Design a protein with these regions (language model features):
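Short, small-residue-biased leader/transition segments that mark boundaries at the very start
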Residues: 1-6
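A structural feature that tracks compact, well-ordered secondary-structure segments
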Residues: 20-26, 32-35, 105-108, 134-138, ...
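Alpha-helical membrane segments in multi-pass integral membrane proteins
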Residues: 68-79, 89-110, 116-137
Length: 151
């Protein structure tokens, strides 16, 4: 993991999502609070798993440990996915694809399969694209006070 990825993942993936989660708490949105703060902390912990060993402050985690960690996040995400079933279809798809992504990445780590890792990466692009579309739709629909992009 390069330094640019560590910076991006720590601040945009981690800190920004934690702040978003805290703002969702202010809005009394339990789902948004749990999802954003949890995934923000995921990114900070994932970066720490890569950075701390590089600094000599912790041992390098085994691929089995990383795989198990990703399985735990897959299970957590599957549980959150159940909370999206009364939400817009696009949000459901983001969480379904995120669940699949965590499991594919964990299988890739546990088996060492490059093919599964590549499939996981492609699936991650799909998940990220859906999330970007959802964010754009939320912003445009609010700004124009009408459904400009369906969700």
């Amino acid at each position: 993991m390069g330094s640019e990825m560590c910076i991006r993942d720590s601040f945009y993936g981690g800190l920004a999502q934690i702040i978003a989660g805290l703002l969702e708490a202010k809005n009394r949105n339990t789902f948004g609070t749990v999802a954003f703060t949890s995934y923000g902390l995921f990114w900070l912990s994932f970066v720490a798993m890569k950075v701390l060993p590089a600094l000599g402050l912790a041992p390098e985690p085994s691929t089995a440990a990383v795989g198990a960690y990703l399985i735990a996040w897959g299970v957590f995400t599957a549980l959150l996915t159940a909370g999206t079933f009364k939400s817009p279809r696009t949000l459901q798809l983001v969480f379904i694809t995120l669940t699949i992504l965590f499991f594919l990445l964990s299988i890739g780590d546990l088996t060492g399969s490059t093919k599964i890792r590549v499939i996981g990466g492609l699936e991650g692009i799909l998940c990220g694209s859906l999330a970007i579309y959802l964010a754009a739709a939320d912003i445009l629909n609010e700004v124009y006070e009408k459904k400009t992009l369906p969700v």
